[in-house]
Amino acid sequence: MEERRPHLDARPRNSHTNHRGPVDGELPPRARNQANNPPANALRGGASHPGRHPRANNHPAAYWQREERFRAMGRNPHQGRRNQEGHASDEARDQRHDQENDTRWRNGNQDCRNRRPPWSNDNFQQWRTPHQKPTEQPQQAKKLGYKFLESLLQKDPSEVVITLATSLGLKELLSHSSMKSNFLELICQVLRKACSSKMDRQSVLHVLGILKNSKFLKVCLPAYVVGMITEPIPDIRNQYPEHISNIISLLQDLVSVFPASSVQETSMLVSLLPTSLNALRASGVDIEEETEKNLEKVQTIIEHLQEKRREGTLRVDTYTLVQPEAEDHVESYRTMPIYPTYNEVHLDERPFLRPNIISGKYDSTAIYLDTHFRLLREDFVRPLREGILELLQSFEDQGLRKRKFDDIRIYFDTRIITPMCSSSGIVYKVQFDTKPLKFVRWQNSKRLLYGSLVCMSKDNFETFLFATVSNREQEDLCRGIVQLCFNEQSQQLLAEVQPSDSFLMVETTAYFEAYRHVLEGLQEVQEEDVPFQRNIVECNSHVKEPRYLLMGGRYDFTPLIENPSATGEFLRNVEGLRHPRINVLDPGQWPSKEALKLDDSQMEALQFALTRELAIIQGPPGTGKTYVGLKIVQALLTNESVWQISLQKFPILVVCYTNHALDQFLEGIYNCQKTSIVRVGGRSNSEILKQFTLRELRNKREFRRNLPMHLRRAYMSIMTQMKESEQELHEGAKTLECTMRGVLREQYLQKYISPQHWESLMNGPVQDSEWICFQHWKHSMMLEWLGLGVGSFTQSVSPAGPENTAQAEGDEEEEGEEESSLIEIAEEADLIQADRVIEEEEVVRPQRRKKEESGADQELAKMLLAMRLDHCGTGTAAGQEQATGEWQTQRNQKKKMKKRVKDELRKLNTMTAAEANEIEDVWQLDLSSRWQLYRLWLQLYQADTRRKILSYERQYRTSAERMAELRLQEDLHILKDAQVVGMTTTGAAKYRQILQKVEPRIVIVEEAAEVLEAHTIATLSKACQHLILIGDHQQLRPSANVYDLAKNFNLEVSLFERLVKVNIPFVRLNYQHRMCPEIARLLTPHIYQDLENHPSVLKYEKIKGVSSNLFFVEHNFPEQEIQEGKSHQNQHEAHFVVELCKYFLCQEYLPSQITILTTYTGQLFCLRKLMPAKTFAGVRVHVVDKYQGEENDIILLSLVRSNQEGKVGFLQISNRICVALSRAKKGMYCIGNMQMLAKVPLWSKIIHTLRENNQIGPMLRLCCQNHPETHTLVSKASDFQKVPEGGCSLPCEFRLGCGHVCTRACHPYDSSHKEFQCMKPCQKVICQEGHRCPLVCFQECQPCQVKVPKTIPRCGHEQMVPCSVPESDFCCQEPCSKSLRCGHRCSHPCGEDCVQLCSEMVTIKLKCGHSQPVKCGHVEGLLYGGLLVKCTTKCGTILDCGHPCPGSCHSCFEGRFHERCQQPCKRLLICSHKCQEPCIGECPPCQRTCQNRCVHSQCKKKCGELCSPCVEPCVWRCQHYQCTKLCSEPCNRPPCYVPCTKLLVCGHPCIGLCGEPCPKKCRICHMDEVTQIFFGFEDEPDARFVQLEDCSHIFEVQALDRYMNEQKDDEVAIRLKVCPICQVPIRKNLRYGTSIKQRLEEIEIIKEKIQGSAGEIATSQERLKALLERKSLLHQLLPEDFLMLKEKLAQKNLSVKDLGLVENYISFYDHLASLWDSLKKMHVLEEKRVRTRLEQVHEWLAKKRLSFTSQELSDLRSEIQRLTYLVNLLTRYKIAEKKVKDSIAVEVYSVQNILEKTCKFTQEDEQLVQEKMEALKATLPCSGLGISEEERVQIVSAIGYPRGHWFKCRNGHIYVIGDCGGAMERGTCPDCKEVIGGTNHTLERSNQLASEMDGAQHAAWSDTANNLMNFEEIQGMM
């Protein structure tokens, strides 16, 4: 074998070639063909030394990236990556090769800089690995060498498979098509070992998945198997059977995991194996029988799979292999599916079940395991099966949604919305209809608890999906949302599920997750691995001592002895011992019970537990089960060396049923063991134990650091994959979710809308100017189309802030306030969930990340949705601009809109694609059809999004499952290092695989009688040598779902109880340390035969305020049934118990000393409603079942049940009675219908005992502590009014310190009255005048406030002043007599300072020239302080349209910007309709429906749109002529003048013409009408007439012909001819068709010019886009306006008018931006005033408009011109301010006054300003140089440089660059110390050319200058 081992570097021995084998990212075919083919033996060598891709390895980027990556990890980049843990020597070799390659690159490839790098190749991106972004480098595969694979054989299978799964080199290794035999054999060995790992299933799947698709399986292995036949060397042939066994094992694993996708490759290999085996056998090689059996098994499986493949039933890898049936034809429980099958649901198959044997032994361990597996599975399957069958039979019932089912809960219209990433994998957000569930109180409901199983189907359960509840948030449930995790089989079907698919979901109440883990554990455990079979299965009553005691171990009990003197006595009693260790099997050597602080039975239990391998300890209530259990653990931990007999640690496993019990037990252990504890279970309430939870231990830095390297590498690798997948998946999932939260914007659906429908949608009916309003460009056409736009409901997009939420949720807030004022009660749902959820599995995201995700989701919704249901608004910018209230809807309108959209989105009916294709105009559809079409588009969008994220979903799920297995490996390391591992039964079920690895030798089960036997068995491993069960089977039993299984099949009998019943030895604790004797009497002898009282309970004090420590109050008030949860409540009992609790609180008992128990959840919340937190905070309220193991001083018990039918429910169960009656220490008071309960035998005995001791009756006797002789009887809540303060009805009569008597009734609390507040009047004299205090007695007396007359010294007025206030301190209230500066009288009182601002109204003249009343005090501010007053005077200016301006002086900006004219336009449009818009100068296109029509059809477009010409043949024909043109073309026939020969209805001849429609008038019958003169020829006897079809008027034909054909020279307007009588346009008339068509053609030409051709519009649109991009100042200073213009230009279907509007906006906004930019050159005060003016212009410009009117353009241009002059003037003045003479300053001020006038800037003003500015140019500088123009010219001339040498720094200081003008060095500005100049002819970025100095357009040294020079210099050269 050694001779055949390949050379380590896989190269020829004497070769030094640098060739490396292929890696993951193989070369493209073209590159591969160009490469040199490596020698065959190089590939056969298998594993060349690890390295990167040959190309990637030889360029500097790969090297430096590697260096940087290693430095970032804090390691030397030249160190080997895997030599930290002392791995095999091949890793050091890897390091050397890496270093050699790096050195080789540095020394031998220096010329690579001059070569083209590989990433510059066009084909380089083809090398990317799947799902890798183009910018990322492919991760390089580290090759797996021979030595490395050999080292893996020495390691644990788990480490092997994790290492292979996370290595990129595995795929490369298995990709070779040939390799040496010994290398192939080693690979098979390693793969077989990897696949043997049981805890790493996902890693095994990953490795097998690579193997399945590899050349290793398809080529290498078949060649190897065939080669066995011809192998000549005997030694090698003898080793083949072992290798064949490895291959068969791999094949078996492959077909079991991938039955569908691997059957072809494996079948070929299997067909070759028999031939090779026969050849080997023939050559004398011994073939083991097991190998042949395994091969036969694989052959059988493959034959079965091939048959199924031919049948077409083998399609996916989730196919379940059929196992052969057992001899008795009963399916083996090991192959039974955990989930229900189709046959179980539909065929109602009766399952094969055996009862749990509780009175004898089992025949075998196999039957024992089978029995418990089937019973446990049936316990959760039966309710689901029977519920679904009942549901299927009820589908035709009309009241199905209201019907209640016994076994299941139903959720209608359930939809799988979106996948979500969680730590456990992929979960799905599912939404169901909440309408039938309005009555559900989710915070208490047991619906949809964590771990509950749901079944979903959309085809009446012909197919179904299974899932479990993975997360339950109350807020989400109220909205019908829950998160589900689907099982593996269902996940395969989810790819085809869309968010629009509607399912029926049913829920079974069982905690399925616990069932699943236990059932899987029972299937996996082998019969021989079940411990204690002699006792558990065979029921042998002889129990041996633990095996580890047979080694002679001795115990030290001194740590258990608390008293030092007792320790000494114990040591003296143990004669001959030099140390305190004893033989525990010898009872005589044990310390005394007094020394150990134990009673007799506890001592017996301790001895029994430590000396028997199976110890059962029964502990009745209060007997100290936990105390004894802790003593046992302390003894075991102290003597760990006795049972830890190997180097490997084996912790003690403690299992408890509830989290509370686990906390109690572990806290007790902590008192004697401060370290090495691990807690696994639900969230702990213990601060002490939080440090020992798995989550905390995992997060410790030391733990991470000490983890094996292969786990750390795997963690990083998988985490990276998860993050990448999560990022992509999250975005897609949130997109899917958004589709159900509102209406999508149309642009996101465009891809799924046909072009015809898109054009129709976007060119929809424009009936309101707001549709195309400039400010509503972001408005959604989709909303309008769906009837949700401004035409139907006004849009409100203000977020659901406090002001909106308060209105919308007023009722909820009130309810919330009421809830918050009540005491906190642990919700039953929360309690159940707390025991189900393992804390380590809870996902706790940082609050910061939650906020970030929420913000990102909000942004995504804002981007995608035109209307959001959560905001009930559009979510558009347009909507937000209207948040001032203009578009606010009423609250009920919002609700209607929200409900309407929500209902439509949840509907299932959609339009089919065929139906959609038949639609031409989507606006012609009714609203219902529109929503159907929208849902079709939405489904296409959702399906596409779902497809995109599907691959990421699969990647994340696989990675998460591998990560979960990795976590288990981490947890395994934690648990193995512990001394004590504490688990709940749920935790033990979930961590069963780890427990099998941890192999705890000692298992202690607390509350063992409450645990199902199957759960206990699944917790045990074959390594268990000592099992201690502690519990009490006479208290609560395990809970089963199915009553039949619990009672008739004994499923509810725990292992604890069964072993007791079959006479396995056990010890019962006999002394109770909890209850006073009166209470204990109820349990003995009725429940426990000989339960004795410990002396400590005889010392309890009596309960205050009552005559007895124990009393049962009888009543017969009926109960009430609660609809949800099948619970009950009793209002009478609730009120009584609450009042009794309040009474005990008055006896000065602490709230923590009182517990209220009830037997039903419904009563729990009935009680809560009666208990305000202010009074009852601290009182605990529980249901009995959740209080086992607890105790309190006083227990108040409400039994609830009281009905005429005598149904007592589970009050007849002795176990529950035991728990209920044994929780009290000192006092217990119960209320119930004892007459009904007496029918139960046990209750009858208890009631008899109570009656014997006078402790039962209709009334409870209360005893007053202050008046012992006074008793009060209470039977109902109202009776407690007799003792309002907890004493009696007598008055208190206690004399208080103030002298008054206590006014309360007798009260036992606050006997010294320190807290009492006397409420009687005080009446103390508090001043010299004899006035008395008006306050109540307990309040502190205040200064006298009685008013008396006093004279105020400052003014002499007499005032009524409070007695205690001195006259000098009082403010006189007489009116002030002083006059203000303005002359008006002061309005303040005399004692106050005079007013600063006079409030008298005076009329003043404003700056605008108008007079207006203002407050007198504001006048000065108006004149000098800049105070503004809005002038309300009507403007009245005659606008350009001729109408008076409707605005006010203020709204028109003092005449500078007039408001739009609001008069109706009423001008005739080209289509002959009157304009319906306000008078705005330029009429918009007509929005009416077009009335053009012909005989074939009518135009359906808007009147202002281009009509489509009719292409039907013209129908104008008669017997003389016929037109041969198309209907829309001018006719090619003349009019016919032959009289019509037809007769009218009246019998007279027609008066019309041949071929024309006959007029309806008769010359004889309607003579007056026909001969009425209009044109002048109507009364001629042979006159012929034509009737107009548009208005039915008739005219003489010759006159009408002339009228229709005449062309008047003065006719300017182009419009249709109209009826001479009624003026109706003539549109349809065949005789005058040519004339009409000519007019219509002219009108169409005008329409086209108005709208513009598509080419012109596109050209203009691109021109404006380019123009806008050049406006850098606009982009910088007005970014929102820039973005708005950019978005508008990006829209489709813009008209010429739209583009004209945009062009105007660009121009005006650009001017504004330039002016804004110039503000920095002014004085601060001037800047503020000009900025205000600019903001006014910007505000006016931002108003919504379709176009600018001529008036607006005039006003705007004039104002911008004024501001331009003003800015120019003020800038010049600022620049030369210090050098300006007084005369020039006066001139500047005069120009400024003209420019700052409030009225409009006229042409006269402009001319005057121009003249003055020309005069000022010579003396004021034109730029920021601070010098005059003359001085600038002189300086430039003196320096003498050509243009382009002058520059300025960041702050505008000028400097010059000599020589060529290009910057070659940096310097410092002497004025501001900023950087100036530059390097390499490149100017510093903060500097720029100072064109204001010499007029240069570019620098002297620049590309532009070098190519073109400065333009003027070129001109000079010419």
UniProtKB/Swiss-Prot annotation:
Gene it is expressed from: ZNFX1
Protein name (database record): NFX1-type zinc finger-containing protein 1
Subcellular location, record wording: Mitochondrion outer membrane; Cytoplasm, Stress granule
Span list, region Disordered: 1-58, 75-140, 796-819, 876-896
Binding site for Zn(2+): 1849, 1853, 1869, 1872
Described purpose of this protein according to its UniProt entry: RNA-binding protein that initiates the antiviral response and is required to restrict the replication of RNA viruses. Acts as a double-stranded RNA (dsRNA) sensor that recognizes viral RNA and then interacts with MAVS to initiate the type I interferon response. Also required for immunity against some bacteria, such as mycobacteria.
Organism: Homo sapiens
GO cellular component: cytoplasmic stress granule; mitochondrial outer membrane; nuclear RNA-directed RNA polymerase complex
Subunit structure: Interacts with MAVS.
Ranges of biased composition (kind: Low complexity): 30-42
Coiled-coil zones: 286-313, 886-967, 1741-1820
Effect of residue 1051 to P: In IMD91; uncertain significance
Keyword terms: Antiviral defense, Coiled coil, Cytoplasm, Disease variant, Immunity, Innate immunity, Membrane, Metal-binding, Mitochondrion, Mitochondrion outer membrane, Repeat, RNA-binding, Zinc, Zinc-finger
Biased composition regions of type Polar residues, renumbered to the chain: 120-129, 877-887
Biased composition (Basic and acidic residues): 1-12, 82-105
PANTHER family in alphabetical order: DNA2/NAM7 HELICASE FAMILY, NFX1-TYPE ZINC FINGER-CONTAINING PROTEIN 1
Zinc finger NF-X1-type: from-to: 1298-1320, 1330-1346, 1382-1400, 1441-1463, 1471-1488, 1546-1564
SMART domains named in the record: ZnF_NFX (SM00438)
Any one GO biological process: defense response to virus
Gene3D superfamilies linked to this entry: P-loop containing nucleotide triphosphate hydrolases
Composition bias type Acidic residues, residue spans: 809-819
Start and end residues, zinc fingers (RZ-type): 1827-1898
UniProt keyword annotation of RNA-binding present: yes
Entry's family note: Belongs to the ZNFX1 family.
InterPro entries: ARM-type_fold, DNA2/NAM7-like, DNA2/NAM7-like_C, DNA2/NAM7_AAA_11, P-loop_NTPase, SF1_C_Upf1, ZF_RZ_dom, Znf_NFX1
Annotated disease: Immunodeficiency 91 and hyperinflammation: An autosomal recessive disorder characterized by immunodeficiency, recurrent infections, and hyperinflammation with systemic involvement. Most patients eventually develop hepatic or renal failure, may have compromised neurologic function, lymphadenopathy or hepatosplenomegaly. Early death often occurs due to multiorgan failure.
Pfam family, one: AAA_12
Expression tissues: Widely expressed.
